[in-house]
Amino acid sequence: MSRVGKLPITIPEGVKVGLNDLEVKISGPKGELSKTFKGNIAIIMEENKLVVKPLAVNKNARSMWGTARSIIYNMVTGVKEGFKLKLEINGVGYRAMVKGKYLNLMLAKSHNTKIEIPSNIKIDLPKQNIILLEGIDKEKLGQFASIIIKQRPPEPYKGKGIKFENKFIQRKEGKKN
């Protein structure tokens, strides 16, 4: 039995849920999200709560049970409060700028890296070495953050690169003579 899947999702005030078989549409003060689920699960609305139940007793249904519940919970949280990620850029001369709908990264390469900003994500740059990402879709926000980090992942010797704000980078000692 899934420990995550069996928990009901309480729908807060100001959030509307629309169910159409396995398609879930959730709208709230921050925006609207929809997702179609596959698999052997049933999504049921009971009073002010959403309940996800498996339809079969096989491994696929059990694994989708908890996953679907977590995705729906993140959708409800996203349209109500939104999600924020903070990225840190470490390195001499490393910086970020927003120009139009592109994020321009200067990361000690022969060229500047341009990344198109998705329409549902907002970027704020309080400093040149800090990137604040905001959005209602947790999955898309994480994917976009990983695209940014891939441009210059943190290296273990000097700690240069782009990383999540509170992520610890294991440092290595350099070569000895």
Swiss-Prot record:
**Keywords for the protein's UniProt record, in alphabetical order:** Ribonucleoprotein, Ribosomal protein, RNA-binding, rRNA-binding
GO terms, biological process: cytoplasmic translation
**UniProt cross-references to InterPro entries, sorted A to Z:** Ribosomal_uL6-like, Ribosomal_uL6-like_a/b-dom_sf, Ribosomal_uL6_a/b-dom, Ribosomal_uL6_bac-type, Ribosomal_uL6_CS
Give any Gene Ontology cellular component: ribonucleoprotein complex
Q: Indicate whether Transferase appears among the record's keywords.
A: no
Cross-referenced Pfam families: Ribosomal_L6 (PF00347)
Asked if Ribonucleoprotein is a keyword of the record, the answer is: yes
> Which GO molecular function entries does the Swiss-Prot or TrEMBL record give?
rRNA binding; structural constituent of ribosome
Q: In which domain of life is the source organism classified?
A: Bacteria
User: Which family does the record claim for this protein?
Assistant: Belongs to the universal ribosomal protein uL6 family.
HAMAP family, A to Z: Ribosomal_uL6_B (MF_01365_B)
Q: What does this protein do?
A: This protein binds to the 23S rRNA, and is important in its secondary structure. It is located near the subunit interface in the base of the L7/L12 stalk, and near the tRNA binding site of the peptidyltransferase center.
Q: How does it assemble?
A: Part of the 50S ribosomal subunit.
What PANTHER family does the entry give? 60S/50S RIBOSOMAL PROTEIN L6/L9, LARGE RIBOSOMAL SUBUNIT PROTEIN UL6M
NCBIfam families given in the database record: L6_bact (TIGR03654)
- Protein name per its UniProtKB record: Large ribosomal subunit protein uL6
The record lists the organism as: Rickettsia typhi (strain ATCC VR-144 / Wilmington)
